């Protein structure tokens, strides 16, 4: 299959950046790569003026780079069977993937083949909402998967398959992103004392106080990459 690898959607998340540089220096067959936000990469910041991955589908008439760039990226995505968009998190045990609502079912199979059986459906203005062939890959900086060599091997394996080989499996856990916990929530509910652990069910009363259906599962708690919010909450999607 034909694959596009995106790195540097956020300019300070190094796995994707280093992976793209590796692929550009030593290409793999049927795999192209692109750095999404080169301006943010230059200054080692998440973004310059606004978060690129909250700016899709973009604004053609804008003079802001991070509003124009989504249009170019979405056009590129149409040329590939699967797009893999790489991200990092400081939170341990948060390795997972994101897809858009209505995404190709093959993306679930691809996630499993890549060793990432937790898949989250997101409907905010990220690339996945508009490129339904895109899997965003989140890897903890502490994870053994935070390694360019490992991903080159995984990419080569995936590129040798046909898209039809990426069949969904019952081993995939599917979640929906339903709530973004704010810093106000952190203070109001004393969340630092709640012992929230990624993908482990939170207390029912706590979920109710945030207006979220139970059972709810936290993710990206107190991530240094996103200090302006506290984390997210997920609901599990029945198989």
PLM feature segments, named:
Residues 1-239:
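Structured catalytic-domain cores with a bias toward divalent-metal coordination
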């Amino acid at each position: 299959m034909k694959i596009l690898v995106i790195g540097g959607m956020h300019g300070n998340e190094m796995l994707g950046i280093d992976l793209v540089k590796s692929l550009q220096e030593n290409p793999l067959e049927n795999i192209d790569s692109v750095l999404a936000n080169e301006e943010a990469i230059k200054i080692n910041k998440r973004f310059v003026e606004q978060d690129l991955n909250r700016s899709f589908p973009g604004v053609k008439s804008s003079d802001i780079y991070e509003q124009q760039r989504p249009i170019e990226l979405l056009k590129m995505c149409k040329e590939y069977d699967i797009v893999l968009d790489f991200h990092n998190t400081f939170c341990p045990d948060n390795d997972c993937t994101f897809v858009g609502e209505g995404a190709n079912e093959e993306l679930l199979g691809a996630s499993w083949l890549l060793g990432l059986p937790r898949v989250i459906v997101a409907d905010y203005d990220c690339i996945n909402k508009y490129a339904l062939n895109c899997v965003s890959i989140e890897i903890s900086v502490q994870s053994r998967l935070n390694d360019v060599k490992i991903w080159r091997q995984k990419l080569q394996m995936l590129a040798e398959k046909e898209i039809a080989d990426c069949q969904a499996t019952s081993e995939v856990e599917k979640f929906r992103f339903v709530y973004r916990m704010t810093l106000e929530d952190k203070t109001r509910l004393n969340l630092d004392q709640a012992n929230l652990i990624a993908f482990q069910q939170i207390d029912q009363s706590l979920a109710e106080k945030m207006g979220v259906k139970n059972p709810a599962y936290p993710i990206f708690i107190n991530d240094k990459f996103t200090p302006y919010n506290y984390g997210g909450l997920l609901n599990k999607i029945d198989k």
